[in-house]
Amino acid sequence: GRHKIVFAGGVEKMTDVSGDDATSALAAAAEREFEADQGATFPLLYALMAKSHMAAYGTTRQMLTAVAVKNHRNAARNPHAQFQAEITPEIVETSIMVADPLRLFDCSPITDGCAGLIVVSEDVAKASGRPYARVAGRALSSDQMFLHRRTVFHEMPGVTRAAASALKQAGKSVNDMKAFEVHDCFTIAEIMILEAIGLFEPGKAGPATLSGLTAIEGKHPVNSSGGLKGKGQPVGATGAAQIGELLLQLTGRAPKNRLIPGNPTFGMAINVGGIGTMTGATVLEGVNK
């Protein structure tokens, strides 16, 4: 309550260094001694999580591809996205292998970008007479940093806890959320997160994506911005960018070609650090739209 109007945002300039140096810097969010410094950087860690998910639920290469194709399709409708073109399944599945089963187009890119939000007290928001989004729930959760110490590689309990807490604060269920922005640093991450928050049963997010349920026009629109995969992943700006996209969707101000149908009121953002080591979950409610 000390301030009524504040600015919150982030920025990241990643392309001034080599890809190897950027990968090394990003690995600071992983366990260094026994994992990252031994070669287990994030592509490999998420590849192990993907292999585990595939073994447990029969998740297929085509399901991972569907995430990438969907998010690039959404990014092509976003003038602020890093990638401005749609891609085909063939492009994804013939791109170079990074860490089996993850190919180049399963991985979010190295990105320059920034995002900013104006956060105000509710009386200021109401007095403005403009559409705004209310923070209905907000939670943080942490989890094991060492992948090799987890008993189940493909589960993200920190994501589950953060989402449940934010939804409880908002007095809503995950099915009340009609727009989602989630941390698809790799295609398998989107699938695991959607299951961790309870939107889909374990093993069902991949088939749901393949069938179109998570498309902008689907029942559960996910990453209308293009996500990290298509919009880009300027790390320090990613969380604010997710909130910014939900603000546009929940107040009806997103461009018409990517506006979620049905005039959604509630949405959820899930931002993840590392392999789910840290999770921020936010529930927003559109007001005055």
Annotate each predicted stretch with a short phrase.
Residues 5-57:
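Flexible glycine-/small-residue-enriched beta->alpha junction loops
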Residues 46-50, 121, 156-170, 245-252:
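Short, well-ordered amphipathic alpha-helical segments that serve as non-catalytic structural scaffolds
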Residues 147-152, 184-207, 218, 234-237, ...:
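Short glycine/threonine-rich loop-to-helix capping motif typified by GTGT followed
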Residues 40-89:
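N-terminal leader/propeptide and maturation segments of large enzyme subunits in energy/redox metabolism
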Residues 20-31, 123-124, 196-203, 286-289:
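A glycine- and small-aliphatic-rich helix-loop capping segment at beta-alpha/alpha-beta transitions
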Residues 2-4, 177, 243, 264:
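Short, high-confidence coil segments that cap the C-terminus of an alpha-helix
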Residues 32, 65-66, 97-165, 213-225, ...:
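Condensing-enzyme catalytic core mediating Claisen C-C bond formation in acyl metabolism
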Residues 153-160, 164-187, 191, 196, ...:
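Extended C-terminal subregions enriched in glycine
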